[in-house]
Structures are given as structure tokens and as C-alpha cells.
Amino acid sequence: VRILLVGPRESGKLKIANYLEKTNSQPLKKVANIMYYRRTILVPDSYLESPWMHKHVIALQQTASCGIFLQPVTAKRHSYPPNFAKVFRIPIYGIVTYHKSYEESALQQAKAQLLACGLEQVDLVLDLEKEELHQIEQIILGRGRENGEF
């Protein structure tokens, strides 16, 4: 399983990638290009912000089993183009991320942004400060991974 991680700044991509890669001793570092790891493909936020780079993100589905679109509650601007998720043939999961706390209006705005990008539902609201990252595995295993292997 290789997961495509896409999200704007402050969405927690690196923290989630570190968890999925199980890199306790040497954490992954932020870089300006696409990084392929054992379990994840990490897309820099600059690829999402630039319309000219969207085609490269779309092409990454060829090497991924599924994708996760992250949306932080703190983001004010629309990160994803309309119906962007509908271009992908692999399963795409929507996750709203936050640190410690959030306002209900900000949460609703983040969910609306994920739905506007073509996702049918928001799969998880995730606190990056708590030890809730295991819920990502449960969502992926729960929707199509019957063999229990991650």
C-alpha cells in the first residue's frame, strides 16, 4: 500500500507521513519536491497552490493505492480546485486536521472546501496533537482493505 498525501501548508502532511512510515529515529523532512517513501508519496504544498502543477499530482495516482486530501481548519483560502478529487481513479479520503482546538465555523468551512473539491464525504476530523493518527489506518482498512494489511 502506498498512500498519496496531498494538502496545503500546516495540514500535517509530514506528521502523518512520519506516522505511516513509522520513522521514530529519523523523522522525514520537508522538501520542495515530490518524495516517494515506502508507504507514502508526499506532495509539497506548492504543487497544490500552482495550477500548472496539478497535472503532476494527478499523474501520481499511477503509483499510489489511495490518496488522502488534508484540509486544516486554519486555512482560509480554497486549496483544491473544484471537483479535483473526481479526476482520480484511486480511492480518495478527506481528512480535516487541527491543532488542539477549533471553532465550529472554521470546521464547517474546512469540510465545505473538501466537499467542493469533489469528495463525497469527509472521512475524519483529526487532532494532530493527540495520538489519533491510528484512525487513518482504520479508515483505509475499513474502506476496501479487507485483508487487514496496511
Spell out what each predicted region is.
Residues V1-V43:
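Conserved G1/Walker A P-loop phosphate-binding module
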Residues S11, K15, W52, S105, ...:
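Charged, alpha-helix-enriched surfaces in structured cytosolic catalytic cores
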Residues K13, K76-Y80, L133:
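Short, well-ordered alpha-helical microsegments
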Residues N18, Y80-N83, A106-Q108:
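Short amphipathic alpha-helical segments
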Residues T40-K86:
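Switch II of P-loop NTPase G domains
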Residues Y47, T74-K76, H99-E103, E129-E131:
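Conserved nucleotide-binding/hydrolysis micro-motifs of P-loop NTPases
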Residues A64-Q71, F88-H99, A112-D127:
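Conserved beta-strand/loop subsegment of P-loop NTPase cores
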Residues Y102-F150:
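Canonical P-loop GTPase G-domain recognition
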